[in-house]
Design a protein with these regions (language model features):
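Selective for proline/serine-rich intrinsically disordered segments
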Residues: 21-23, 27, 47, 127, ...
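Generic structural signal for short, solvent-exposed loop/turn connectors between secondary structure elements
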Residues: 28-43, 78-94
Length: 194
């Protein structure tokens, strides 16, 4: 009996020693994973809004491309002294552009974007044409007028919200839009910003 007890005791002591000699559990990367998630969260906080602005700017480019036929119509009509919106058929609305309209009196082109680009009420860009006051020695830029023949080449200036002065070079600043543009400057091309 003593022998059985000693063998049993020996086995228990041996098992306890084996447990004591086991290596301790390794360090787990749980804290490192939290740090990585925090870094990804911070990067995403900056990247996602920047990407959304990039998408809106690319959609504005579509509107400016659609306005090129309107610019051509205004230039043709200004050269002949006709109504500045004569013969122009606006393009069909797209997913990004609601309308492209010409003001028949001044030739200003208003591009209205859908809510995919900017919120309703803050989604128009205005293109303003101007011409030199005299063909031979211009001293200023003047707005186009319905029925008046224009002297010299037409210059176009783009206006977004916040731009309240012309940035055309000499012979002088061009006219301002009759209807203020409402598209936020962050979505507009550089030449449309203040």
């Amino acid at each position: 009996m003593f022998e059985a007890f000693s063998v049993s005791l020996f086995r228990r002591v041996a098992a306890d020693l084996r447990r004591a000699n086991r290596p301790s559990p390794r360090w787990r990367p749980a804290g490192f994973t939290l740090i990585v998630l925090a870094i990804v969260g911070v990067v995403a906080a900056y990247a996602i809004p920047a990407y959304q602005d990039y998408l809106a700017r690319s959609r504005v480019g579509e509107g400016l491309a659609l306005a090129s036929s309107a610019r051509l119509a205004v230039a043709d009509n200004a050269a002949s002294g006709a109504s500045l919106d004569g013969g122009y058929s606006p393009p069909a609305a797209t997913r990004n552009v609601e309308s492209v309209a010409i003001d028949g009196e001044t030739g200003q082109i208003t591009v209205a974007f859908t809510t995919r680009v900017a919120a309703a009420g803050t989604n128009t860009l205005v293109l303003v044409p101007s011409a030199p006051d005299k063909a031979d020695a211009p001293t200023a830029r003047v707005a186009l007028k319905k029925g008046a023949m224009q002297a010299g080449a037409i210059a176009w200036e783009c206006f977004a919200a916040g731009k309240d002065a012309s940035s055309l070079p000499a012979p002088g600043a061009g006219p301002l839009p009759g209807t203020a543009a409402t598209l936020p400057a962050k979505y507009a091309p550089a030449e449309c910003r203040a």
